[in-house]
Curated annotation (Swiss-Prot):
Protein name: D-fructose-6-phosphate cytidylyltransferase
Any matching Pfam family: IspD
Organism placement in taxonomy: Bacteria, Pseudomonadati, Campylobacterota, Epsilonproteobacteria, Campylobacterales
Biological role stated in the UniProt entry: Cytidylyltransferase involved in the biosynthesis of capsular polysaccharides. Catalyzes the formation of cytidine diphosphate (CDP)-6-D-fructose from cytidine triphosphate (CTP) and D-fructose-6-phosphate. Shows less than 1% of activity with ATP, GTP, UTP and other sugar donors, such as D-fructose-1-phosphate, D-glucose-6-phosphate, alpha-D-glucose-1-phosphate or D-glucitol-6-phosphate.
Cofactor names: Mg(2+)
Example of a GO MF term: 2-C-methyl-D-erythritol 4-phosphate cytidylyltransferase activity
Biological or metabolic pathway of the protein: Capsule biogenesis; capsule polysaccharide biosynthesis
Amino acid sequence: MKNIALIFAGGTGQRMNLISGMPKQFLLINDKPIIIHTLEIFSKHQEIDGIVVVCLKEYINDLHCSIKQYSIKKIISIVEGGDTGQKSIFNGLDSIKKYSKINPYIVIHDGVRPLITHDEISKGLSCAYLKGNAISISKATETILYNEQEASILNRDKCFHVKAPQIFQFQDIYNLHMMAQKDCFEFIDSASMASHYGKELYFVECSNNNIKLTTPKDFYMVQALMQAQTIESIFGV
């Protein structure tokens, strides 16, 4: 397997403040769980050979049922998540160790980013083939204030949001996780981890529509954008 998508669906979605307590990745948009929308995109991409999903333990059976219901292909395994996002990603990587001799490219993506496109995945893979990694970014659309000791306004033209997918060769990202465990460091994402350990990163631009569903506002934005895509595909407008 040359390319394996590692989809993180292990979050509890506390910032969504859901009365039901259901994790955000299982919320429905167009009568389909958000995680399934995301998995469909990767399963239909010609360059993705297999998919590993990291999921909350108590929802693994539900995910198995949804994958069967919507006929999602290329699933290698569903892995139990850890206490943190970083530990969850490592659990996914650990399940891929059997392919380590091939040293596949690992396409790390959030299960709650269902608006990633095939073209954006392809651009990331092309960059990773040439340079060893690829980090998705989008242009900052609002002014950013940096405030550590003395507040300063950053030049928005030089600011970007770091998003996903983030693509690394297996051995590189696995070794980075091992170093982070040894040093007892927790990072917000793989790009931050790689940067901390001095790895040169390469960037590919994606659309600002590649939203990570974190808050109720994000849910309504993603829902509206997906409905707009459906209308466009039907009527060509």
